[in-house]
Amino acid sequence: MTKYSTELKIEIVSKYLNHEDSIKGLAKQYNIHWTLIRRWVDKAKCQGLAALSVKHTKTTYSSDFKLNVVRYYLTHSIGVSKVAAKFNISDSQVYNWAKKFNEEGYAGLLPKQKGRPRKVPKKSKKTTKKLELSEKQKYEEKILKQEAELERLRVENLVLKKVAARYPRYPTNKKHN
């Protein structure tokens, strides 16, 4: 619920634009601060009376939009309220974005993760690391080399067994006294 309805805003701004009363006179008549009426008038001049309508949904702005608003504010020598009226956003929003941009740069305009962090981290599924083709080929080549070495050692072992069987005078398993 907003403090001032759309109809009231349009009525006050229309009276000012039709030169029926001054901003200070309207402020006294409706018991509203004159700077607020000035913002409504600026917004209506830039974007029409439709810009005074009350928004009931929370708008999330992209970081590019924020950057455009801040750049416009910094390059043009006009106030926060005029920039806010031009882009149909609140004055405080322009001020906060400009402040964050000056302190943190573009990173300050990026969306932040909101809410309380989880106490227990999410259990992640085990992911198998996919090997690149070059790594896979290296492992296959290594396996082939090891298999060839194993076959060579088997043949050598077989030859040694046959030599030991043919020439028994060279004992292989007997202990020396």
UniProtKB/Swiss-Prot annotation:
Q: Which Pfam families match?
A: HTH_28 (PF13518), HTH_Tnp_1 (PF01527)
- Region feature Disordered, mapped onto this chain: 112-131
Please list the GO biological process terms of this entry. Answer: DNA transposition
Q: Which InterPro entries match?
A: Homeodomain-like_sf, InsJ-like_HTH, IS150/IS1296_orfA-like, Transposase_8, Trp_repressor/repl_initiator, WH-like_DNA-bd_sf
Q: What is this protein called?
A: Insertion element IS1223 uncharacterized 20.7 kDa protein
What transmembrane ranges does the database entry give?
none
Alphabetical keyword list? Transposable element
What is the top-level taxon of the source organism? Answer: Bacteria
What does the similarity note say?
Belongs to the IS150/IS1296 orfA family.
SUPFAM superfamilies in the record = Homeodomain-like, TrpR-like
